[in-house]
Each structure stands twice: as structure tokens, then as C-alpha cells.
Amino acid sequence: TARKVFDKFDANVNSLLRNPNRGILDSDLSDSQFTVRHLQLFPNVLYYVVKGDSIIISAVMHYKQSPQTVYKTVMRSLERYR
């Protein structure tokens, strides 16, 4: 159900508060300003950045999205933080 999906998502996001570096480092999306990490929340992937004491969730996308679509989406969402 939608509630179960939300609860799982919420628990994973809250776990980032305790361990922000638990996600997998995504070197293809990282640059000198941002270290992008991702969590696999099947069938979705959550892309995020730790910046100071904040966690910026840049995208939540279905795992079948093309690498180009993921790159464009994540980069576009991080533009406002540059």
C-alpha cells in the first residue's frame, strides 16, 4: 500500500540523520562542490548530498531511468545550492 511505501521511505530518510554517509558514493555525479550519494529504495533510488549539517535530497527516481536522465535531474536540482 501507499502507506507502507511512505513509511519505508520515511524510515530510510530518517536513518540518514543518524548516519548521513551510509549511502553509496556516486562518483559519476559528484564534483568538487558536492559528494552525491544514493540509497536504493527498490524500485526507486534516492540521490542526496550532505552539505554542512543539512541533507539535500536532489532526486528520487525509478531505478530504470537512464544514466543521462539521472545526471540531468540531479545536476539541475543542485544548481540552486551552488
Residue positions per predicted region:
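Basic, Lys/Arg-enriched alpha-helical interface segments
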Residues: T1-V36, Q68, R76-R82
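Enriched for short, Lys/Arg-rich terminal
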Residues: L41-V45, V49-R82
